[in-house]
């Protein structure tokens, strides 16, 4: 295939150290051997004058483990379009080591010449492993796609706003976390950063006290167990995108998966602002705490928010934030359309 310019490496979505009968598990060792063979093939191909250079690489279901330096360098040499969908070992939670490796080693190694970048995973980037691209610079990046990137704080998103060359930005099924139930020692073990969040009072606190304000509870070190809330909203984020990315011409914000935007399956029929916020409690992400208690589809940790109109409640947040979020999104979309029309 002398004219090949794109290569997709598709692994099993299931990671396990053992090959179990009747299952499509793929051990880490086999995955690394596969990548090693592919990287060698790519280097051998470069010595053939009649063969094109492969510049686009798709790593579908890449296991969340660091690559050996030589393997990484050989695999990513000449790549300017990189698309990664991460899978977690044995279906477990994401590893902090890989999030750090991604931001400090893998991405910087290709940052100078990368034109397109896609990162997808399952509720990745915040708890239990934070991805923060602070300091990342992609001077040639024109297109960035993130799927299920979970945002705890504004500074987690600032690295995106610093890529001033972006023309296309796709945020698929990305969420801002508004409420979080801190449980110890898990949060200390995970080193969760809730800087800027406010701790809500214990249930026993008198909610009717005139001097009470949820804004008066600063982030504590270490985090005390209990509920915390975050004031960050998508309206703020949309405004910052519009103000900080002057070349942006195409922006997508909707619930969508890899199969839709990358493999061409029909998009789900839902509102662009559908499920844009998340809560975190008892080790899982969700949106049901935004619903009234009598409409909740399953048993949840709801007793805390059953006091009607209590300060900081997530109940009704989707409805309360919808006008500002929609206006900011429409203003951003109008700005991108205007830029396209001016060309």
What are the language-model segments listed below?
Residues 1-139, 153-158:
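Leucine-rich repeat
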Residues 139-343:
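Leucine-rich solenoid repeat modules
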């Amino acid at each position: 295939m002398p004219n090949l310019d794109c290569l997709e490496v598709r692994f099993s979505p299931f990671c396990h150290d053992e090959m179990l009968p009747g299952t499509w598990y793929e051990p880490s060792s086999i995955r690394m051997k596969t990548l090693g063979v592919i990287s060698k093939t790519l280097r051998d191909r470069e010595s053939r004058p009649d063969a094109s250079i492969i510049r686009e690489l798709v790593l579908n279901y890449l296991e969340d483990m660091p690559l050996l330096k030589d393997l990484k360098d050989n695999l990513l040499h000449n790549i300017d379009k990189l698309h990664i969908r991460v899978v977690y070992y044995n279906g477990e939670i994401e590893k902090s080591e890989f999030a750090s490796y991604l931001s400090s080693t893998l991405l910087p190694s290709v940052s100078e010449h990368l034109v397109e970048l896609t990162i997808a995973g399952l509720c990745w980037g915040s708890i239990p492993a934070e991805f923060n691209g602070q300091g990342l610079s992609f001077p040639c990046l024109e297109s960035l796609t993130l799927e299920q990137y979970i945002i705890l704080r504004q500074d987690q998103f600032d690295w995106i706003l610093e890529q001033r060359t972006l023309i296309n930005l796709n945020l698929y099924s990305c969420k801002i976390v508004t409420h979080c139930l801190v449980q110890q020692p898990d949060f200390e073990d995970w080193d969760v950063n809730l800087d800027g969040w406010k701790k809500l009072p214990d249930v026993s606190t008198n909610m009717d006290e005139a001097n009470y304000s949820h804004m008066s509870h600063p982030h504590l070190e270490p985090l005390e167990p209990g509920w915390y809330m975050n004031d960050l909203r998508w309206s703020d984020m949309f405004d910052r995108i519009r103000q900080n990315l002057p070349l942006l011409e195409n922006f997508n914000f909707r619930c969508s998966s890899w199969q839709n935007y990358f493999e061409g399956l029909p998009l789900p029929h839902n509102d662009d602002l559908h499920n844009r916020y998340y809560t975190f409690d008892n080790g899982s992400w969700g949106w049901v705490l935004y619903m009234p208690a009598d409409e909740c589809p399953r048993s949840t940790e709801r007793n805390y928010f059953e006091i009607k109109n209590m300060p900081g409640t997530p109940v009704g947040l989707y409805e309360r934030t919808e006008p500002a979020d929609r206006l900011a999104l429409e203003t951003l979309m109008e700005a991108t359309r205007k830029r396209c029309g001016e060309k």
